[in-house]
Amino acid sequence: MRTPSDRLDRRTVLQGLGAVGLGWAGAAQALDQPRGPVVLTLSGQLRKPNDGRNAHFDMAMLERLPQTSFSTRTPWYAQARKFTGPLLREVLAAAGAHGSLLRAVALNDYWVELPIDDAARHDVVVARLLDDKPMAVRDKGPLFMVYPFDAQPELRNPVYYSRSAWQLRTIEVR
C-alpha cells in the first residue's frame, strides 16, 4: 500500500518539469565557443559568458546573429555608406548582458561610454561589412559600432557621433 509520502503530488511533478524545461532552454541559448580568431570580447555583467566571466565572439558567431543593413551618412565618409552586421542589442542578448552602461573600446584603446538603453532605442549596428565587404583595420574594421544617423535625424549630433566606435574590440557592460 502506498502512503502519501511515497507518491509525487501534482505540484512537485510540475515544478520538476518546469525546472528541467528551464534547464533545457538555458542550454539551448548558451553562447558557443569561438572557433576562429576572437574579434569581439564582452566583459562585465554577463549571464552567458563562454570563457570565465567574458563572452568572446569570432566573426562566424557574429555572422550567425540576425543581420541588419542600413545606409547612412557619417562624419567619417564623404558619401552615405552601407553598414551590415548584428544589432548591438542582439550581441548583448547573446551574452546575457545586463547593466546600465557600456564602455566600447577600440583596438587603439580609444573608448567611449554609452547608455545600454541606446541599444534598445536605436538600431545600433556592430557592422562587420562596409558596402557589402569585410572591413580591414585600416578601413575602420574589422568591427564598427555605428548609429543609423539618416534614419533618425536626432542622432546627427556630436553626442551620438562620439558614441560610434570603429576598430571595436571590447564592450564592457557595467
Name each region found by the language model.
Residues G16-L22, T68, A94:
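Residues within well-ordered alpha-helical secondary structure of globular protein domains
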Residues R2-G21:
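N-terminal secretory signal peptides and thylakoid transit peptides that target proteins
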Residues R2-D6, Q29-R174:
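N-terminal intrinsically disordered, low-complexity segments enriched in P/E/S/T
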